[in-house]
Amino acid sequence: MALLLLGVWGILLLLGLWGLLQGCTRSPSLAPRWPPGPRPLPFLGNLHLLGVTQQDRALMELSERYGPMFTIHLGSQKTVVLSGYEVVREALVGTGHELADRPPIPIFQHIQRGGGIFFSSGARWRAGRQFTVRTLQSLGVQQPSMVGKVLQELACLKGQLDSYGGQPLPLALLGWAPCNITFTLLFGQRFDYQDPVFVSLLSLIDQVMVLLGSPGIQLFNTFPRLGAFLRLHRPVLSKIEEVRTILRTLLETRRPPLPTGGPAQSYVEALLQQGQEDDPEDMFGEANVLACTLDMVMAGTETTAATLQWAVFLMVKHPHVQGRVQEELDRVLGPGQLPQPEHQRALPYTSAVLHEVQRYITLLPHVPRCTAADIQLGGYLLPKGTPVIPLLTSVLLDKTQWETPSQFNPNHFLDAKGRFMKRGAFLPFSAGRRVCVGKSLARTELFLLFAGLLQRYRLLPPPGLSPADLDLRPAPAFTMRPPAQTLCVVPRS
């Protein structure tokens, strides 16, 4: 191991010298003026200023010195960081297609090869996104039929929770319901919680998300050649291939034998129907159908499941907030009436708590964009192909927008009379052309599941721990998921 580390450092030294020589001979940047930023080191750039975890906080600290728009070097790659509500919103909403692309992130280039929805760009991304938005609308994500499926899943989750008899259970179990709702939408059926396919998919998704957030993948994305030499990407690619194997089987069993004109009953069925139509640019060929399904499985499960887990965990951490939510639910719904989407107006405190959860946890701190053309932004001219990081954490914790940004405070979303109020700086789903395609469904299912759980259960820390003992530091993963924890779920009398 010592010899291997010496060899790696030798490679880094040689590459650093090469980078220094290249910097002396490289032609000037196309942009007449970059935002200010810290001076980079040869080869490493500014990586020494960023931690391995919670890099968004390190970037926010740099913004205090260099301003809301600054340049950092991730290795040799110049990258522009946007920090704070005003500049992030201007970039995401005010620029149109010029900032709608993704930069070529090495690990996702290996996984998706430019396909799918979330890390693709250009015509393929536009076609995939338009199709997905249209299909979700046609499947009725806001209609009573989908509400019924969410409430059915809530009933199944309650049955699973009841089986523990008030004994400690893993927080991760609460993510099963949101995952199954996504699978119902994608595949047209829910899975039993003991179904081997369901169990395998959840386990693989969990492993992939942990690997994607690992230091090894961060190193691979910054120095892909070195990372490939060290085979840092192999573990995650191996797990992704296991997911693909399951998805291929699910796709094959849902492939219509002949072109049909009837409405699709699931996202996958709609994808397969689209692939049977005239598709001269192969937008919906077999490879991209699999890539789109993989994207929806990974992103559509992790984010909503982690948010529900955080919401429950924060109620255990803040029992006084939990009590106020339950008082409101008892007053408006009583013990027997299940929550419905239209109840949100009558439940302002419950709605405020859910919004505050999403603000406070900053689940996806930043997903980079890339300039599709030379662009004027914040007084600077950024050339085509510049990676740009809109730092969503800085928006959700912006001191100019939130009264107590570092505290969990549902009053951020309540006016002086206790009525729910929207906040412009509430951007957990991002904004503009890349806003989350599943935003509407996520909001509906989070409200129904959260309200349904608190209506029925008291959420308590495990024996031997008090709420003050609970550690809120996120677990290392691609998203800022909650730590592995147990809790007790006890029926309310």
Curated annotation (Swiss-Prot):
Example of a GO biological process term: xenobiotic metabolic process
Gene Ontology MF annotations: all-trans retinal binding; all-trans-retinol binding; heme binding; iron ion binding; retinoic acid 4-hydroxylase activity; retinoic acid binding
Localization: Endoplasmic reticulum lumen; Cell membrane; Microsome membrane
Keywords, sorted A to Z: Cell membrane, Endoplasmic reticulum, Glycoprotein, Heme, Iron, Lipid metabolism, Membrane, Metal-binding, Microsome, Monooxygenase, Oxidoreductase, Signal
An example Gene Ontology CC term for this record: endoplasmic reticulum lumen
Named cofactor requirement(s): heme
Highest taxon of the lineage: Eukaryota
UniProt binding sites for heme: C436
Function: A cytochrome P450 monooxygenase that may play a role in retinoid and phospholipid metabolism. Catalyzes the hydroxylation of saturated carbon hydrogen bonds. Hydroxylates all trans-retinoic acid (atRA) to 4-hydroxyretinoate and may regulate atRA clearance. Other retinoids such as all-trans retinol and all-trans retinal are potential endogenous substrates. Catalyzes both epoxidation of double bonds and hydroxylation of carbon hydrogen bonds of the fatty acyl chain of 1-acylphospholipids/2-lysophospholipids.
Protein name: Cytochrome P450 2W1
Source organism per UniProt: Mus musculus
